[in-house]
A protein has these predicted regions:
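Carboxylate-rich, polar loop motifs that coordinate divalent cations or form catalytic acidic clusters
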Residues: 1-240
Length: 240
């Protein structure tokens, strides 16, 4: 009886190991250093066709399910890619030298606005009325034809403070993570803006709003969160 139990146990272990073995066999690895002159992956995005786009410190790569191919275009080649974002059939490429819109259906790449040329683009977001672009020091408001509406400068006099991240919610609020806290921008009906500091402290690395309408604030080794509808400096709760 003991012998039978041991056999059953061995068979069970073998059966349970198959899914993990299959998973390991299906994991693909790409060594950028071995074949390309790229070092750091900075972002990843999936488009409406299911293809994966990788932003690197020296350009953009496309993974079509079989292989990696560099996106070769004079406007974005050799650019440091801060982030990738997509809307409909357009991939938005935020670089240290401007924001570019790449239509992957027509294979066409354009600078979104001359105002953004040579600027360090940190984030791109949109709502039903506006397109909002954050550089490391400023926030630009555009309509959907990339006509300029308004610009707000954050920490104009501070040389050691920069915008690190941005999220928008509703049609009239944008939240900025900076190297020293959290700033909210209220967008008026006429497109004018005003800003207030909600929280001062350590550098904010990333902001995220979840499906329950809670704001997550990543500060390196610590995460803060708050209900976005009642956000103020008192109601932010922290956990590790």
């Amino acid at each position: 009886m003991k012998h039978i139990s041991k056999v059953i146990l061995v068979l069970l272990c073998i059966l349970l190991s198959y899914p993990f073995y299959g998973m390991a066999q299906n994991i693909k690895s790409f060594d950028f250093k071995g074949n390309f002159f790229y070092n750091t992956i900075t972002s990843i995005e999936q488009d409406t066709l299911g293809f994966m786009w990788l932003g690197l410190d020296n350009g953009v790569f496309l993974f079509d399910g079989y292989s990696l191919q560099p996106l070769i275009h004079s406007m974005i080649s050799d650019r440091y890619v801060n982030f990738l974002s997509h809307r409909k059939t357009t991939l938005y490429i935020g670089t240290n030298e401007g924001l570019y819109a790449y239509n992957y259906i027509n294979n066409q790449c354009d600078l979104c606005s001359p105002l953004l040329k040579s600027r360090n683009i940190i984030a791109y977001q949109c709502n039903s009325d506006y397109q909002v672009v954050a550089t490391d020091r400023e926030v630009f408001l555009f309509d959907y034809n990339w006509n300029f509406i308004h610009k707000i400068t954050i920490y104009k006099e501070s040389l050691n403070n920069h915008i690190t991240s941005m999220v928008i919610y509703g049609n009239q609020e944008a939240l900025l993570g900076t190297e020293s806290g959290l700033v909210i921008i209220h967008i008026e009906n006429d497109g004018k803006t005003k800003s207030n500091t909600l929280y001062s402290g350590d550098k904010i690395v990333q902001l995220f709003i979840d499906s329950r309408n809670k704001l997550w604030i990543c500060r390196g080794e610590e995460i803060l969160y708050s209900n976005i509808d009642t956000l103020d400096s008192v109601e932010i709760s922290g956990f590790k």
